Design a protein with these regions (language model features):
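Expand to "…catalyze enediolate/carbanion chemistry for C-C bond making/breaking, isomerization
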Residues: 1-208
Length: 208
């Protein structure tokens, strides 16, 4: 079903004159790319009108919806969990950002893109000094507290100790630095850090 929807959307994009498209997951690269290849392969070419940038104005819209500390907390937990997996040699990790809470919510496989999105969401709220529905101000102090609380909760729920607990503490400090970097418009990817770089961050002062 998802593949069919993606294929239909990319077919529409190709027919509007776009030569290639963006897809969220590598699994859908073929289904997303085929409409462009097939149309271009048929000899079809976009018209001159389709090349006019004014046909595609950029729209910057602020989405409507509640802003909650709980949402920021879930992103903080996801980020700590992901960085822990990275430190443990995994580029993707099954993460339940609602672990320990009532209800059925299985872990979802998350990768580096999710880590970057969680980092960006938190950093945006800090940069814009967003207040949640209950009036809480998003600043470094709040984010630091959420990272600490979620790390503590992960360790407690998993009854972790020793090396495993230490890895989560290390992940917490790296996550904090990653968020701090984004608020300074430094979008360096986690993949560009060496093990030595990450060790220095973990051994250094708190970023937040």
């Amino acid at each position: 079903m998802a593949g069919e929807a993606i294929n239909a959307g990319k077919k529409w994009e190709a027919e509007q004159g776009f030569l290639r498209g963006w897809v969220a997951h590598i699994f859908h690269m073929k289904v997303a790319g085929d409409p462009f290849k097939e149309l271009i392969g048929s000899g079809w070419k976009p018209s001159a009108e389709m090349r006019d940038p004014s046909r595609w104005p950029v729209r910057l819209e602020v989405p409507k919806g509640p802003i909650t500390v709980e949402g920021t907390r879930r992103n903080a937990r996801m980020l700590v969990e992901y960085v822990e997996g990275w430190l443990n040699g995994r580029g993707a990790k099954g993460i339940d950002s609602l672990a320990g809470k009532p209800g059925i919510h299985p872990a979802l496989m998350e990768d580096l893109a999710t880590g970057r999105m969680s980092t960006a969401r938190i950093a945006q709220r800090v940069l814009h000094r967003v207040r949640s529905e209950d009036g809480a101000l998003h600043d470094f102090a709040l984010v630091k507290r959420l990272l600490q609380e979620e790390t503590d909760d992960i360790i407690k729920l998993g009854s972790l100790s020793g090396e495993a607990a230490a890895r989560y503490r290390k992940a917490q400090k790296i996550a904090a630095q990653w968020i701090r970097n984004y608020t300074a418009f430094d979008f360096r990817s986690l993949g560009s850090y060496t093990r030595a770089d990450l060790d220095r961050i973990a051994a250094g002062p708190e970023a937040l």
